[in-house]
Design a protein with these regions (language model features):
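Core nucleic-acid recognition elements
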Residues: 1-221
């Protein structure tokens, strides 16, 4: 990538600006282009036939069931039930309301915001909810956010002394936030952003895990 930018600067006959370099770093990031996730893997000298991304896509390709759209936008759609909608006959002029039956399509979206939530739990989780809402609003011809869920996975929270399994390992020094701070602030942030858009956070899951064996420490971080 550095060689590419140097060649580009030579072609333009000038140094690239900070804005151009930072812009390139965003649009050419793994987050946007999946250069690793969708890249070619060569293991022990043998090129693998499928990328990690194509292997995940294969599930819906082999068993589409009620999938309407997947991996073509920033959100997936599945076929929903037939529903009645009470709405104006026309949207461009004053008109009577009517009840009309139509085939609904349900949007599904998962947004991971692990590192931002680790650094700043409230706003990290809030913008995670925001990204999920944004992508569903912009998917296809647009969809309406109705409800959200959240999953939190951290090391042991150590809320009290009555959980013997949490006391078997010494608590590590945390680089950014403690697990209990993440659980409390992230939950507040995800709910707060959803409420501002009329999307309540209605359910979710919470997992905590730590394990030490042969001087090796494992856990949700």
């Amino acid at each position: 990538e550095i060689n590419y930018l140097n060649d580009l600067a030579n072609k333009l006959g000038r140094k690239l600006t900070d804005s151009e370099v930072f812009g390139f770093s965003q649009v050419n990031s793994e987050h946007c282009r999946h250069k690793i996730f969708n890249g070619t893997f060569i293991i022990d000298g043998e090129e693998k036939p499928s990328s990690l991304f194509s292997m995940i896509k294969e599930t819906s390709k082999q068993n589409p069931n009620d999938i309407v759209s997947a991996y073509k936008d920033n959100v997936a759609f599945i076929r929903g039930p037939k529903v009645e909608q009470f709405a104006p006959t026309r949207a461009d002029i004053p008109s009577y309301y009517q009840t009309e039956e139509f085939q609904s399509v349900i949007s599904l979206k998962a947004e991971t915001h692990n590192f931002p939530t680790t650094v700043e739990p409230f706003n990290g989780a809030a913008t995670g909810s925001g990204g999920e809402i944004r992508d569903r609003l912009a998917g296809g011809k647009g969809s309406l956010p109705l409800a959200g869920t959240a999953v939190y996975m951290t090391s042991y929270s150590r809320l009290g002394n009555n959980r013997s399994w949490e006391q078997k390992m010494k608590e590590r020094p945390w680089l950014y936030q403690t697990p209990v701070d993440i659980l409390i602030k992230a939950s507040n942030g995800a709910s707060d952003f959803g409420n501002k858009f009329g999307q309540p956070l209605i359910t979710g899951s919470l997992f905590t895990f730590e394990h030490e064996e042969d001087s090796r420490k494992l856990g949700f971080d």
